[in-house]
Amino acid sequence: MLLLKISVYAVVIFFVGLFVFGFLSNDPARNPNRRDME
């Protein structure tokens, strides 16, 4: 049961980090070469 809980937390943290990374990467001021991804 502990392993399952750790796995769930790992997946949640992974998706949150992916969302934050994607949000920062889509910022035109930080990465203007990604305008075609919008």
From Swiss-Prot:
Record has Transmembrane as a keyword? yes
A Gene Ontology biological process noted in the UniProt record is:
photosynthesis
Would the keyword Transcription regulation turn up in this protein's UniProt record?
no
Principal localization reads membrane
Name the residues that span the membrane.
1-21
Q: How does the protein's chain sit in the membrane according to the entry? A: Single-pass membrane protein
InterPro entries for this protein = PSII_PsbI, PSII_PsbI_sf
One Gene Ontology cellular component term attached to this UniProt record is: plasma membrane-derived thylakoid membrane
Q: What does this protein do?
A: One of the components of the core complex of photosystem II (PSII), required for its stability and/or assembly. PSII is a light-driven water:plastoquinone oxidoreductase that uses light energy to abstract electrons from H(2)O, generating O(2) and a proton gradient subsequently used for ATP formation. It consists of a core antenna complex that captures photons, and an electron transfer chain that converts photonic excitation into a charge separation.
| Subunit note | PSII is composed of 1 copy each of membrane proteins PsbA, PsbB, PsbC, PsbD, PsbE, PsbF, PsbH, PsbI, PsbJ, PsbK, PsbL, PsbM, PsbT, PsbX, PsbY, PsbZ, Psb30/Ycf12, peripheral proteins PsbO, CyanoQ (PsbQ), PsbU, PsbV and a large number of cofactors. It forms dimeric complexes.
Name the protein family.
Belongs to the PsbI family.
* Matching NCBIfam families: PRK02655.1 (NF002735)
Name of the protein:
Photosystem II reaction center protein I
Organism listed in the record: Synechococcus sp. (strain JA-3-3Ab) (Cyanobacteria bacterium Yellowstone A-Prime)
Encoding gene, per UniProt annotation: psbI
